[in-house]
């Protein structure tokens, strides 16, 4: 039987999020309570690869939207962009075994879209992580932990993000965990 695209309510989207420098600063310091979520919030290396290892059948990326857009004021500040400066914004669902596990949002300043950076606009359904972690030019900065303003059950409550640098270019990658990812008994 073929796998369907992700089943999810259409209103599921990237929620407003409060960002912290660490799990402890976000109040996620109790392993007994936050253990499975902590695992996903602290995965080192490629998050995409960790999700692929969790899959029993198939991992895929669904594009929700991508194109030039204005980053949020907080994202612009994090990337040192002028207010209302356009950037390439990509929002996707990362799905495993036919179910959405993660919403991801990437903000890429226009200055990073030249030369090798042109590939970032043409990823299609390929995971961004596969590109970033296959290129030694890209270096990841520290992970930040996000507490999301969840709209209802099933919406992201936790997130992680980091800056990736290549020379003077930086892009911001946020991964918003859907509860079914860390409530599942199989972490990977």
From Swiss-Prot:
Please list the residues that bind substrate.
90, 128, 175
Q: Has the keyword Lyase been applied to this entry?
A: yes
Q: Which InterPro entries match?
A: Chorismate--pyruvate_lyase (IPR007440), Chorismate_lyase_/UTRA_dom_sf (IPR028978)
List the SUPFAM superfamilies: Chorismate lyase-like
Per its UniProt entry, what is the enzyme's top EC class, as one word? lyase
- The answer, when asked if Repeat is one of the entry's keywords, is no
Q: Which residues form a coiled coil?
A: none
Task: Offer one Pfam family short name for this entry.
Answer: Chor_lyase
The record's Gene Ontology cellular component field reads: cytosol
The entry's localization annotation reads: Cytoplasm
Q: Which GO terms describe its biological process?
A: pyruvate biosynthetic process; ubiquinone biosynthetic process
The family assignment reads:
Belongs to the UbiC family.
Protein name (database record): Probable chorismate pyruvate-lyase
Tell me what organism the protein belongs to: Marinobacter nauticus (strain ATCC 700491 / DSM 11845 / VT8) (Marinobacter aquaeolei)
Upper classification of the source organism reads:
Bacteria, Pseudomonadati, Pseudomonadota, Gammaproteobacteria, Pseudomonadales
Q: Which gene encodes it?
A: ubiC
